[in-house]
Amino acid sequence: MPKFAANLTMLWNEIDFLDRFEKAASAGFTGVEYLFPYAYPKEQLAEKLATHKLVQALHNLPAGDWAAGERGIACIPGREGEFQDSVGKGIAYAKALGTQAINCLAGLTPKDAPAEKVHETLIANLKFAAAELKKAGIPFVVEAINTRDIPGFHLHNTRQTLAVLDEVGAEDIFFQYDIYHMQIMEGDLTPTIRANIARIK
């Protein structure tokens, strides 16, 4: 059976973020997700989850300067150290919140770097993250995003994303298959899901 978590980034935007946990519980949800927890102390978020008997289903690794338009840094050469630090921060929050999975946003394809270098950087960063998350016992997922909503997003379809995960070679890295994004990019959802269900979270 499907399990649904309320996305607190998208829902109830008319009220303060910290008040959305109560809204989710009142609406019958038992799990929540949101883009990033890092603007709030871990302890404060953990208290909200416990008070309203909610599970933290997912959050993303830090994704660079979101307000400035960045959408992840995993594919950006020269920022490997920052990415590694972001993995540590993501794990610290996930442990405090009991997060069931961490997602990595690859980022926008940099226009000033050779394609081969961009690819090498992404693979190396995902290998690092997969190893660290495995040690922490936290499931790891990678998401493809449609390029209509986010032009230039590096991972944007099923075949490309699964090929990247194959190259990373970790047994416990999965594809966060977002039906909304993949319908825009490629359609044919049911056969794609059936063919790849073992690799989808």
Predicted regions, residues:
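Active-site acidic/histidine proton-transfer and metal-coordination neighborhood
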Residues: 73-174, 184
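Hydrophobic residues in well-ordered beta-strands that form the structural core
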Residues: 56-58, 142, 177
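Hydrophobic residues within beta-strands of alpha/beta enzymes
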Residues: 32-33, 102, 140, 201
